[in-house]
């Protein structure tokens, strides 16, 4: 799937903690980053199929004063390094605390809409992969298809009613790539 210069691209929006990497309570140290097995390869397959890869992450630890934005950026850089050779097209985060209602904090779709504007994304052809009910809700609120992975909190959040539930990011990528094959065959 390639896009012409004036055409919108499809994207895969990704939760970070519990989806790409093992859940760490308020991860503020790059040494705590532990990418799940198969994640770099799955991301690379999606990238090669033409999907933009965009991380959408709540980072309330900043708003609560548990860590600083520079500390968050160091963790973000380690995640990016750990998934090479795949690369992210964008990383969007919301530092707000949960008690502050904003249009950016998941489950609100503000970060997805921001990425859509920045990256010329066709939401109708896009997906959100996450391990939490708020990831599924965020994706639904933005009008994208949703996949709940059972890594992180996902094993306990199946009531979120995603479009698909799967064990991990590799299996989620397989679903997307198979759907892509079916749509190209039509």
For each feature predicted by the language model, list its residue ranges.
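Metal-dependent phosphoesterase signature
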Residues: 16-37, 62-71, 84-86, 96-103
């Amino acid at each position: 799937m390639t896009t012409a210069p004036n055409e919108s691209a499809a994207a895969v929006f990704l939760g970070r903690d519990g989806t790409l990497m093992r859940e760490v309570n308020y991860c503020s140290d790059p040494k705590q980053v532990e990418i799940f097995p198969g994640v770099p390869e799955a991301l690379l397959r999606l990238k090669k199929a033409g999907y933009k890869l965009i991380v959408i992450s709540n980072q309330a630890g900043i708003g609560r004063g548990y860590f600083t934005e520079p500390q968050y950026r160091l963790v973000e850089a380690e995640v990016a390094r750990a998934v090479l050779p795949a690369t992210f097209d964008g990383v969007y985060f919301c530092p707000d605390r949960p008690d502050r209602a904003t249009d950016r904090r998941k489950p609100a779709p503000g970060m997805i809409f921001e990425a859509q504007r920045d990256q010329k994304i066709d939401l109708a052809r896009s997906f959100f992969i996450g391990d939490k009910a708020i990831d599924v809700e965020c994706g639904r609120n933005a009008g994208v298809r949703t996949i709940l992975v059972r890594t992180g909190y996902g094993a306990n959040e199946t009531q979120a009613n995603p479009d698909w539930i799967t064990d991990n990011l590799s299996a989620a990528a397989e679903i997307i790539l198979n759907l892509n094959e079916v749509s190209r065959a039509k």
